């Protein structure tokens, strides 16, 4: 997808690997100035070599105070991609307080915090903007051992709608992308059992999982003016799974 983001500044969380990393690369190639946020410094070092000129920020978004310190003075942002997330696989009866708190602090609370910072600045500057929350199809369907992750993504669905309603009058659009399994490092955890992965893939009408590029293209579309009247919804990148 050929889009031009020249003159715009984007912030991408979870930028070190997978979907976030490729989103940074695509935005950089499309002319945007990009702030890349992740907690692993080595990922930022290698990403900066691939994308000269990006602004790397190393912070654990699960730490509220550290995030405030790292991003509180980040400056104007026109495009935000909330991609940071983690998966802790446990059945319901074995979910620990630590796993629950960690999952919600990274997968959901950080979306609140970073979005508040960015949206307040957009409003103060009187400029439109676009926010994309990277969710999952498990916001809508259940999978074994993903109850905590699914709960964070289900909550993100309502957060996206509420943000769109409240920020819409300020010309700030908010949407989500909801992919099926994407074979990133995180996605491979879900599909580690070959037999489970085979059966799961067969339940997708297109008989495939999503490629990282598929998700990135949907993110870019929602960030761009080509989706100027789209807000409060989500794009399913699920190879038809929910339709089945």
Curated annotation (Swiss-Prot):
Residues reported to bind NADP(+): 11-39
Subcellular location: Mitochondrion matrix
Tissue: Predominantly expressed in lung, in ciliated cells, non-ciliated bronchiolar cells and type-II alveolar pneumocytes. Also detected in adipose tissue (at protein level). Low expression in testis, heart, kidney, spleen, brain and liver.
Subunit structure of this chain's protein: Homotetramer.
InterPro entries: L-xylulose/Carbonyl_redctase, NAD(P)-bd_dom_sf, Sc_DH/Rdtase_CS, SDR_fam
Gene Ontology annotations for the cellular component aspect, listed alphabetically: mitochondrial matrix; mitochondrion
Gene name of this polypeptide: Cbr2
This protein's name: Carbonyl reductase [NADPH] 2
PROSITE patterns reported for this sequence: ADH_SHORT
EC category name: oxidoreductase
CDD domains named in the record: XR_like_SDR_c
Conditions for induction: By glucocorticoids. Activated by fatty acids.
Residue stretches spanning the membrane: none
Additional remark text: Uses both NADP and NAD as substrates. Has a strong preference for NADP.
The protein's Enzyme Commission number: 1.1.1.184
Species assigned in the record: Mus musculus
Pfam families: adh_short
């Amino acid at each position: 997808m050929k889009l031009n983001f020249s003159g715009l500044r984007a912030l991408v969380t979870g930028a070190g690997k997978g979907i976030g990393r490729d989103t940074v690369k695509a935005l950089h190639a499309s002319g945007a100035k990009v702030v890349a946020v992740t907690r692993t410094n080595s990922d930022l070092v290698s990403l900066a070599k691939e994308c000269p000129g990006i602004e790397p920020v190393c912070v654990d978004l699960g730490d509220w105070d550290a995030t405030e310190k790292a991003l509180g003075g980040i400056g104007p942002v026109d495009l935000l991609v909330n991609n940071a997330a983690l998966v802790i696989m446990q059945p319901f009866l074995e979910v620990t307080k630590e796993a629950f708190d960690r999952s919600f602090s990274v997968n959901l609370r950080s979306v609140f915090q970073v979005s508040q910072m960015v949206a307040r600045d957009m409003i103060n500057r009187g400029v439109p903007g676009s926010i994309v929350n990277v969710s999952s199809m498990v916001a809508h369907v259940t999978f074994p051992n993903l109850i905590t992750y699914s709960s964070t993504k289900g909550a993100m669905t309502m957060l996206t709608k509420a943000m769109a309603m409240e920020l819409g009058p300020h010309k700030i659009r908010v949407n989500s992308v909801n992919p099926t399994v994407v074979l990133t490092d995180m996605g491979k955890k879900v599909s580690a059992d070959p037999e489970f992965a085979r059966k799961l893939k067969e339940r997708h009408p297109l008989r495939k999982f999503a490629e990282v590029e598929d998700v990135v293209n949907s993110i870019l579309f929602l960030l761009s003016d080509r989706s100027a009247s789209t807000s409060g919804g989500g794009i399913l990148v699920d190879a038809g799974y929910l339709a089945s």
